[in-house]
Amino acid sequence: MTQQSPAFISPIWLKREQLIDVPEPIMLDWLFNQDSLTRRLDRLSDGGFSVFPQFEGWQALRRDECLALGLPLASEGWVREVYLCGNDSNWVFARSVAARSALQDGGLNMDELGTRSLGELLFSDPAFARGTLEVCHYPEAWLPDAVAARGLWARRSRFSRGALSVLVAEVFLPALCNTIHDKDPV
């Protein structure tokens, strides 16, 4: 589990048109691509994609997560943190959250995913609608120690199906960035 953030840490999540610090074109393409990241990573790894769970459980959601989901601050939710891996290398740190009340009524069993990708589930159910992609430089303090670094790009979006909303944040780790540059030039 990543450490709980100090109250003063709050990233500024921006839409594409709000970016001032614009990443290079290849990274911009990956950050704002609307397709399934799971499928894209599977292609990039030539079928060597896997999910490595780090933490799953109930906890108070972060301020930015509550705001994005329209919840009262410090609402409790299910938190799932995983590495999305390509050929046994950590490519993405993903944190997915949903409010307890929405999960209890929404018929999504996030606690039963195990090593299955949440993205696979969300993109296979046409009832889920994806909201706007937003990006930021993810706070180093929010990352697991094994991959903590400054200035890593992250994206997030909200997936909604009726009253159920799941907020998915994906942090692009250096190993993915290196692989993208080597194998997937724009």
Swiss-Prot record:
Reaction(s) this enzyme catalyzes, per UniProt: chorismate = 4-hydroxybenzoate + pyruvate
Protein role: Removes the pyruvyl group from chorismate, with concomitant aromatization of the ring, to provide 4-hydroxybenzoate (4HB) for the ubiquinone pathway.
Compartments where found: Cytoplasm
Any one GO MF annotation of this record: chorismate lyase activity
Keyword Lyase (UniProt): yes
HAMAP family assigned: UbiC
Signal peptide (residue range): none
Main location: cytoplasm
Protein name: Probable chorismate pyruvate-lyase
